[in-house]
């Protein structure tokens, strides 16, 4: 298991320096993820030390409420513990004729089930494998497809793959002896986007299957990670994805190799530096009309969130991890 220690933002983040003094009273409204309550509270307290005229109104009852509040104009910020769904993007685009602006604000947890956990690929401890590539995971969990849609509703035929790339026995992964002809039993979360646990499934689709939505027809679906782990524990020839917190004495997580790279184990350090390929993130979405400036108070707050102080607040308060300095700079650029 990953040891739990305080997460401090590494060096390399810009300190927050107010670019204006906000005249009040100004109220910033947020709706969305109840998992982000502690982190949001820490950000608000830290920001108000610099901008005392700003107040906040938070209705954080669940990620599924976030986008509806944003496009109904009753929220300035949509806090989400998963990426926006295609349907949510479509509704926003139909109403506003543009898509919401996505700002990544924190890295998910290495092992907390309620903190946008990194996806652990679990197998039996008896399994000789120690690692898999993302391409191999696609072969195991996916099926032939003609392409995939991305978040901008663009079709990508280069994401296509044939049935010849399916991996259905352990022998196809190089295992010999008793394992050679054994079928790979696959376990995971429900594949419907309307499931309460759609976040892990959607992340797996994006990071492993290039956004494709054609799954191995033999995938066995479970609504909870513990149920996935329990099923894996009873099945020597199974593989599944869940939270590291669900690991049992009978299971082990595999190291995962990105395209063209070496396999990376799932540890706190590899999630923190985002080298583990199945690391996940949390987001704040705002309604910004392309070509127009972000509301000044909102821009100041998000600049604080992405600053050294804001990223340190994450480690002190929430169970999430800071971004890397480079990703924080990329997110700041979106606000310009």
Say what each PLM segment does.
Residues 3-336:
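Flexible loop/hinge segments at secondary-structure junctions
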């Amino acid at each position: 298991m990953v040891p739990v220690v305080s997460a401090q933002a590494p060096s390399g983040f810009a300190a927050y320096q107010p670019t204006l003094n906000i005249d009040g009273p100004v109220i910033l409204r947020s709706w969305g993820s109840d998992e982000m309550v502690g982190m949001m509270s820490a950000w608000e307290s830290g920001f108000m030390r610099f901008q005392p005229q700003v107040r906040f109104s938070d209705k954080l009852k669940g990620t599924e409420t976030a986008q509806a509040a944003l496009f109904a104009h009753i929220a300035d910020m949509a806090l989400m513990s998963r990426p926006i769904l295609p349907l949510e993007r479509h509704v926003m685009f139909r109403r506003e004729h543009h898509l919401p602006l996505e700002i990544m604000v924190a890295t998910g947890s290495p092992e907390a089930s309620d903190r946008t956990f990194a996806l652990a690929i679990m197998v039996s401890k008896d399994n000789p494998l120690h690692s898999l590539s993302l391409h191999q995971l696609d072969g195991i969990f996916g099926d032939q497809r003609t392409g995939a849609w991305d978040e901008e509703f663009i079709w990508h035929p280069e994401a296509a793959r044939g049935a010849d790339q399916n991996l259905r026995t352990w022998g196809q992964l190089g295992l010999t002896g008793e394992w050679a002809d054994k079928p790979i039993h696959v376990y995971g979360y429900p594949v419907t986007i309307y499931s309460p646990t759609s976040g892990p499934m959607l992340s797996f689709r994006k990071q492993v299957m290039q956004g494709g939505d054609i799954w191995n027809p033999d995938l066995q679906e479970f609504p909870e990670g513990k149920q996935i782990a329990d099923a894996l524990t009873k099945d020597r020839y199974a593989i599944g994805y869940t939270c590291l917190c669900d690991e049992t004495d009978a299971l082990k997580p595999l190291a995962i190799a990105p395209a063209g790279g070496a396999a990376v184990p799932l540890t706190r350090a590899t999630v923190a530096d985002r080298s583990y390929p199945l690391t996940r993130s949390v987001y704040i979405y705002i309604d910004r009309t392309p070509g127009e400036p972000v509301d000044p108070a909102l821009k100041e707050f998000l600049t604080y969130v992405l600053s050294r102080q804001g990223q340190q607040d994450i480690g002190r308060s929430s169970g999430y991890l800071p971004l890397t300095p480079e990703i924080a700079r990329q997110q700041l650029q979106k606000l310009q």
